[in-house]
Regions:
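C-terminal beta-signal and adjacent terminal beta-strands/loops
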Residues: 116, 687, 695-714, 731-733, ...
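N-terminal Sec signal peptide and the immediately downstream disordered periplasmic leader
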Residues: 1, 5-60, 65-72, 134, ...
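Periplasmic N-terminal accessory/gating domains of Gram-negative outer-membrane beta-barrel systems
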Residues: 22, 39-156, 166, 170-172, ...
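Gram-negative outer-membrane beta-barrel transporters
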Residues: 460-465, 567-576, 583-708
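Surface-exposed extracellular loop regions of Gram-negative outer-membrane beta-barrel proteins
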Residues: 123, 298, 476, 494-544, ...
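Face-selective signature of the C-terminal outer-membrane beta-barrel domain
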Residues: 275-298, 311-478, 603-613, 617-628
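Transmembrane beta-barrel strands of outer-membrane/channel proteins
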Residues: 181-189, 240-244, 290-296, 335-341, ...
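Transmembrane beta-barrel wall of Gram-negative outer-membrane proteins
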Residues: 179-180, 213-298, 315-332, 397, ...
Length: 790
């Protein structure tokens, strides 16, 4: 499989995917380097996944997170996808170079697709105020995309409002030479996998839940896709892609306090995707794109210990964008106008939630909570205008320049709404209501203006090139003026691309979290007989930012081996966390957000791959080995993010020693050393492709907070929070994918694929509790995939 890896001195200052689509727009100082690699790896800060890469990789549920799982700059939270919850199909969180998983920039065709409403709240619990969110605004099906580019370091100035990195997904553009329809079907089910469950978890697993944590012992996943590319007139055409990903999960309908299961029901987890792009090549000077996009996610739940607690939680996002490329005599101008609606919601079947202290439900007696808490949602409408001007390359003496300038304005209309009145109360033994709370119907909004200006120049002299740039951001939410310097230099030592060194310094300011402003609006609709109130303070926050020092090396070894080494050092400053206190006089709970969070991260990767595949008896063999190491220290939990409340602790007890909290290794997304061997075998005459990944992960640690009943608890340090690390063993996993495209069916182009994940059925612990209950990664899993082009 051919991979095109383009030198980063140009691409660090340009949109990589567009540079691939339109090479005339972005001029390259050096010739492109052609390599063959099973899995894309970072090249000077960016990793480009073509549609061919996406087809090759076993992408599991088909989300962008699944695609990036093997990237050496990325770490996943290993507790998200385990043997307990394999029926879930939602995107997983990712951390890039140790940064917050809620501070990545997601884009579609260069327009923001980030959900910054309340991405740290992924709880599926039933409550009057809980609206589950996620940082990916659109739950895209990667099989419908043209390409995806991850910017993890040396990120160009046109990308902002992130701390970790940028992920830009490109929708396919009409191609008159490729008028095809593609149908696809992909499936797996619980009968096709092995689940590794701790003995102490088996009862809850078989009952399908533990409190507000949901398990999936019995599920079926069925994914359907349809895409086409059609010419409508001369120089005018359309592409479209539709998909439905559905997981049907059988869970307990009700479980009594004694653990008695009273029937089971089927619950659906669905993600729908619709993408379309109309393209008009109006002339040699003008090209227009009109893009339509939609994703809708819904998840059915009940709380198995609450009768009548059925609810639907989900996300709906849709938008449109118009792009116009104009070729001027001396420059290229791109203008983009877009609108995106991103929303999260919780809709209960009932509007009243109450608890009877003594009740009977069917054959079950005891304490009975039941009901629901109505319909609540929050959303943001983003109206975007952006423009960018790329000058043609010109020379001043022996130095060439290619500057570009850009501006962007986004108006964000954020709102939260309770669609109907609901209430909660307790019925005591005397049959009277107590603890009565009313949640009033209401709607409130925030309007935010976001302004951006940026400029950069590509400067080249002989075999040295520089990319200085600067970005300015301002918004009236936190009212901070943020200036981000970006700089990169590349040296082609022998001027023949056999030895190249890249280095740079960059600053990345993060995005806003809108829920901090919406929370008081939502809480104002609550009337409690106790008179309790809540107040949120966030207005004096600084914008969190990351400073980056990075270096990259590329070396050609002999005639056919390419080695790449990358080092990234990140310091995260002014990270948001919170503290809470209660004013007893006014019965007000005050939540105050602060900038006390900080982390330091060292990230290193090394890869070896071939410039040309090995040819043995009509078989192309593409080997690749990748080493990656990421280690972070800091005073906040990446999973908790801006809801972290421990950053005010100057000292803690860690593994028996009283230490500074910010010297403690970060516990989540903690998979420091990973080594993977990727090997593809392609037999062109038969149409067989066998792709393999053998991955080893070093032993790592799970963080446990000690209580007074734990043996390791030190009573003389009772004034401090105490933590201990428990070792989790190293792991070796083998994932394989076998695809067959029968050569005798050229007209239909049928492809049948089978994925086997964790072929060795390794039992890998990913977490443990202070009582010693372990959680394990999924065991061996089979997927079947069939597609046809015609």
């Amino acid at each position: 499989m051919k991979r095109v890896l383009i030198p980063g001195v140009i691409l660090c200052g340009a949109d990589v995917a567009q540079a691939v689509d339109d090479k005339n727009m972005y001029m390259h100082f050096f010739e492109e380097m052609m390599v063959y690699a099973p899995v894309p790896v970072p090249v000077n800060g960016n990793t480009h996944y073509t549609s061919e890469s996406i087809e090759r990789l076993p992408t599991g549920n088909g989300n962008i997170s699944d695609l990036l799982r093997t990237n050496p700059a990325v770490r996943m939270d290993s507790t998200q996808s385990t043997s307990l919850n394999q029926g879930d199909i939602r995107p997983e969180k990712i951390s890039i170079h140790g940064a917050s998983p809620y501070q990545n920039a997601y884009l579609i065709d260069g327009i923001s697709a980030t959900n910054n409403l309340n991405p740290a709240n992924e709880s599926d619990a039933s409550s009057a105020t809980n609206i589950s969110g996620m940082s990916q605004g659109y739950y895209l099906d990667v099989s419908l995309l043209d390409n995806v580019t991850l910017y993890d370091s040396f990120v160009p100035v046109e990308f902002g409002r992130f701390n970790g990195g940028g992920i830009d997904a490109k929708i396919k553009r009409f191609n008159a030479d490729d008028s095809k329809v593609k149908l696809g079907y992909r499936t797996t089910r619980s009968d096709w996998l092995t689940s590794h469950i701790d003995e102490n978890n088996k009862s809850a697993f078989n009952q399908d839940s533990s409190g507000s944590t949901y398990y999936s012992p019995d599920f079926k996943k069925n994914f359907y896709t349809l895409s086409f590319n059609q010419e409508l007139a001369d120089n005018f055409g359309v592409t479209a892609g539709l998909s439905r990903r559905q997981s049907d999960i059988t869970r307990a309908d009700y479980v009594s306090n004694d653990g008695i299961v009273a029937g089971r029901a089927q619950y659906k987890n669905v993600i729908d995707t619709a993408l379309s792009k109309f393209t008009w090549f109006a002339s040699d000077r003008f090209t227009h794109d009109l893009t339509l996009k939609y994703t809708g996610s819904s998840r059915d739940y009940n709380t198995s210990t609450f009768p009548q607690s059925d609810r639907e939680m989900g996300n709906k996002s849709y938008g449109l964008a118009w792009d116009m490329d104009t070729q001027l005599a001396w420059a290229k101008l791109r203008t983009t106008v877009g609108w995106d609606h991103i929303s999260d919601y919780t809709r209960h079947d009932h509007d009243i939630w109450y608890t009877e202290l003594s009740c009977t439900y069917g054959d079950i007696t005891g304490r009975c909570p039941r009901g629901g808490l109505g319909h609540i949602s929050q959303a943001v409408d983003n109206y975007t205008f952006k423009t960018r001007l790329d000058w043609q390359k010109f020379a001043v003496g022996n130095v060439s320049h290619q500057p570009y300038f850009g501006a962007e304005y986004i108006y964000s209309d954020a709102w939260t709404e309770r669609h109907n009145q609901s209430e909660s109360y307790v019925i005591n033994a005397a049959g009277k209501k107590t603890n009565h709370t009313i949640y009033l119907k209401g709607k409130g909004r925030l309007g935010i203006d976001n302004y951006t200006l940026y400029m950069a120049d590509r400067i080249s002299w002989r075999n040295v090139s520089l990319m200085p740039g600067v970005r300015y951001d301002y918004d009236n939410y936190l009212s901070n003026h943020n200036i981000s310097p970006r700089f990169m230099t590349e040296w082609d030592i022998f001027a023949n691309q056999t030895s190249m060194i890249t280095a740079g310094y960059n600053r990345y300011y993060g995005g806003n979290i809108l829920d901090m402003g919406l929370r008081d609006i939502r809480n104002s609709w609550t009337e409690s007989v106790s008179g309790n109130k809540t107040l949120t303070r966030y207005q004096d926050l600084k914008t969190p930012y990351n400073d980056e020092l990075a270096m990259g090396l590329q070396q050609k070894i002999g005639k056919n081996v390419i080695a790449r080494a990358n080092y990234v050092y990140r310091e995260a400053h002014d990270q948001i966390s919170k503290s809470s206190r209660t004013d007893s006089a006014t019965k007000t709970t005050i939540t105050e957000y602060n900038n006390d969070g900080k982390t330091k991260t060292h990230s290193f990767s090394l890869s070896f791959e071939l410039a040309e595949p090995l040819h043995i008896r009509q078989v192309d063999i593409n080997p690749q080995i990748v080493f990656s190491y990421i280690k972070s220290k800091g005073n906040l939990s990446l999973n908790n993010g801006y809801e972290e409340s421990n950053t005010g602790d100057n000292q803690v007890v860690y593994n028996g020693n009283l230490v500074s909290y910010d010297s403690v290794p970060v516990a989540d997304f903690n998979n420091p050393l990973k080594i993977s061997l990727n090997m593809d075998f392609t037999h062109q005459p038969s149409g067989l492709v066998w792709a393999n990944t053998l991955a080893w992960q070093e032993a790592r640690k799970a963080r446990i907070m000690l209580g007074k009943t734990n043996a390791q608890y030190i009573s003389e340090y009772s004034d401090y929070k105490q933590y201990v690390d428990e070792k989790l063993d190293s792991s070796l996993t083998w994932d394989t994918r076998l695809s067959w495209t029968p050569q005798f069916l050229q007209q239909q182009n049928l492809t049948i694929s089978a994925d086997i994940l964790n072929v060795l059925d390794s039992k890998t612990a990913v977490d443990t509790t202070n009582t010693g209950v372990a959680t394990y990664a999924s065991g061996r899993t089979f997927w079947l995939d069939v597609s046809m082009k015609f």
